[in-house]
Amino acid sequence: ALAKNAEVGMCRTVAAGLKPGSDVANLSVMGYDPAVCYTGRSPLEAASIGVDLKPTDVALRCNTVTLSGEESYEDKTMVDYCAGDISTEEAHQIIETVEKELGNDIYKFYGGVSYRHCLVVDNGTTDLGNMTPPHDISGRVIGEYLSKSENAAPLIDLMKRSYEILKNHPVNIERRKKGLHEANSIWLWGEGRRPQLENFKEKNGVSGCVVSAVDLLKGIGICAGMETPEVEGATGYIDTNFEGKTQAGIDAFKRGTDLVYLHFEAPDECGHRGEAQNKVKAIEMIDSRVLTKMLDYLNGCGDDYRILIMPDHP
């Protein structure tokens, strides 16, 4: 019924010359020009986990990944970019060990959610060559995707050293016993400096709220001065708390918020994993467990409204 009575069309969320990704695309959807304000993915995620970046700091996304067991690091294969969707509790134990063994006055590691974490480099550079996103090379030998830039060499060394530190970590020993993918290496990418986003309300004349499970979206919201409520059970995957996130959006409207940016990562995550059936299922659950509830509220609240449904990057 919604599609039947709606205006349907296409739009470009990633401008020519920019790498397609959730960071650039969501900034565009929110009305920001990434060509002007985008400084990298990880600084936005860092804001979400409470990392206060100095102007000279460079932040990088630090994935916990599963690599195969070849002796040479370059010969290993990217088995799993998310280490079997590792739990946040397990991942924090991994990152705590990495920080203890590899952290110092220059490198500081911070735990995020599930496999998504952060490295901050003091007085760092963003001129690192091609720091390949791990989800782009699933099933491939990693050697040709390691940056050959001289500036990136210390970071590649951290990745190599992390494998030796983590291959027999207690968390991984237990995951091995259970037949689960191990978080046996870190993978660094998404470098950038602290962003400067114009306040969303000052820019648009309306207040905003971002409801999302992932640090990237929450970080954009924080940097833009928007509300970013925490939702219990929000995982960023197909098992997320669809109803809880929808209710958080409704609660924001009840508090007087003008615009709610309700974001669901599940279809994108299923796509990265090659799970076509789960991607369809995720979209169907957004339809049945999110839109139905939200439209019931909007139709009964007595206010005029507009609703936009779209992917961030097709």
How does the language model describe each region?
Residues A15, E70-H92, S114, D136-S149, ...:
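Conserved mixed alpha/beta catalytic, RNA-binding, or beta-rich assembly cores of soluble enzyme
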Residues A1-N104:
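Active-site nucleophile/metal-coordination loop of metallo-enzymes that catalyze phosphate/sulfate
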Residues A282-P314:
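Metal-dependent active-site segment of extracytoplasmic phospho-/sulfohydrolases and closely related
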Residues G69-T77, V121-V141, A224, T246-L295:
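Active-site His/acidic residue clusters
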Residues A91-I95, L155-L166, F242-I250, I283-L295:
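Short, hydrophobic/amphipathic alpha-helical packing segments
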Residues R193-A282:
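Anion-binding catalytic surfaces of enzymes that hydrolyze or transfer phosphate/sulfate esters
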Residues Y81-W187, E191-R193:
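Glycine-rich, mobile lid/loop segments that gate access to catalytic sites or pores
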